[in-house]
Amino acid sequence: MPSPMNLSSSVTVLAPATVANVVCGFDVLGFALNEPNDTMHLRFTEQPGVTIINEDDYNLPTEPARNVAGAALLAFLRAVPEPVGIEVRISKAIKPGSGIGSSAASAAGAVVGANQLLGNRFSKPELVEFAMYGEEVASGVRHADNIAPGIYGGVTLIRATTPRPDIVPLSAPPLFVTVVHPQIEVKTSDARQILKQQVPLKLAIQQWGNVGALVAGLLQHDYNLIGRALEDVIIEPVRSILIPGFQEVKQGSQAAGALGGGISGSGPSLFMLSKDEATARAVEAVMHDVYERLGLDHHTYLTTINQQGVTLVAPPSA
């Protein structure tokens, strides 16, 4: 096990983007993407505590308690009995406010990397719990639907987050994911504030049915059922008004053969699931066309589901 006194010990990790909610599973479903990824380099320091170094131009806080990765590491270190100092350098390829888990990537990468430095003392559920403190900094809520797939990989169901995270990994058939990120910013905290706090029972019943059907479709590798279940009757009608081109992308993508999709996390990114790469490329063309007509800068990703979560680029070195 690496010792905190071995101050040359370091590790480099890739932390993946993630799609949260997966249309109908608000705060309880998510999956990891094979691209883009943040790169994070962690090493021990002589001074106990957390040091944050941002290697990009996003002007993110470096005070640990106000930084997503920093808050996650502070929670991690509170569970470590001996005094430990960790420096983390963050190079973000996942733009903050994009809706594809930028804050979760920082938090998940930080705790997985720190756990590697300390000899993997903590379990994945414990790492999720630490990383949720970072999400609280970003959104005001300690949620895990980006964190869990970022740490576990694949598709995850969050059965509960209290008193301890109860994460259920789900198998899924091969799926292609097309993501478009229109270059506007939607803050998670703002997107949560506009949500209704009370839901009519009729809509709740519809949503439960969709979540159950989506989980069943994934487990049974039933593409048709997956497509039918990708319906949100509670969150999407409220949040979609924040995203220009939402209806055009959704309708055009389904006409091109996509199984379905919707808002990634709180937006503004939109995602669509397809059974094959040819359909995913047709969906990408639809997305380009919509935002070119709207005159909005945008970026697309055509990728697949990342089954590993945060991965080591370079193992702990002495």
Where are these regions (language model features)?
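Acyltransferase
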Residues: 174-251, 255-256
